[in-house]
């Protein structure tokens, strides 16, 4: 799988992320993708070949392996990374759409466009507010959901996070209960616990970032509400002054007309 392309795409999202989001991307790249590519694929590369059962019954070994490992650990982690990274791509698409609209306004010569050239639009960092805030917050929520679902699926599918040394299988077509052995169970257990721990750290970072965004959102709303409370009073004063001026002008005009008619 081409993880470099995924890193390039998510690297663009890093520019528009919060500080916590940048830490999450760092953990994702270094402790998950790099470990998955460099080490985990080698550890699980021989899992089916070195899965040994003490029977010569044709098909028994394959059935037992499928029973204990319906999905390979390495493939499940790769699928998890794809699902967890997909919401961040929504943010990248939203930013690309905003940038495209800015470029279109610039080319049309719109007076509302405050940019000097296309390069300034291309390198602009958008603030997380408005519709981008909703997109970014929804992406974090779905990341949390995907992380939690995959951790539960992992625990449920493999009956825990430890790799047993001995597995007893009695599935058909095995003639009786046979003993099956996994290669490098301790090493695989260490990698499994490490990946689960990193996934838990990512969940905590997502929760912290979600709380941070919600706090900023409500503070911004309360600040706007406070400004709106003071702003109407200011508008009322301005309207009162304007009405007084209009009355003075109206009275002066009436006096002028009366004086003109009387003369």
From Swiss-Prot:
UniProt tissue specificity: Exclusively expressed in the cochlea of the inner ear, where it is found in cells of the tegmentum vasculosum, cuboidal cells, supporting cells and clear cells.
InterPro entries associated with the record: Connexin, Connexin_CCC, Connexin_CS, Connexin_N, Connexin_N_sf
GO biological process terms on file: cell-cell signaling; gap junction-mediated intercellular transport; sensory perception of sound
Extracellular side: 41-75, 159-189
Keyword Transmembrane helix in annotation: yes
Bilayer topology annotation: Multi-pass membrane protein
Subcellular localization: Cell membrane; Cell junction, Gap junction
UniProt keyword list: Cell junction, Cell membrane, Gap junction, Hearing, Membrane, Transmembrane, Transmembrane helix
UniProt keyword annotation of Transmembrane present: yes
Transmembrane segments: 20-40, 76-96, 138-158, 190-210
Pfam families the UniProt entry points to: Connexin
Topological region Cytoplasmic: 1-19, 97-137, 211-263
Primary residence: membrane
PROSITE patterns from the UniProt entry: CONNEXINS_1 (PS00407), CONNEXINS_2 (PS00408)
GO molecular-function terms, A-Z: gap junction channel activity
SMART domains linked: CNX, Connexin_CCC
GO cellular component, one term: connexin complex
Record-stated family: Belongs to the connexin family. Beta-type (group I) subfamily.
Reported function: One gap junction consists of a cluster of closely packed pairs of transmembrane channels, the connexons, through which materials of low MW diffuse from one cell to a neighboring cell.
Binding partners and assembly: A connexon is composed of a hexamer of connexins.
Annotated protein name in UniProt: Gap junction beta-6 protein
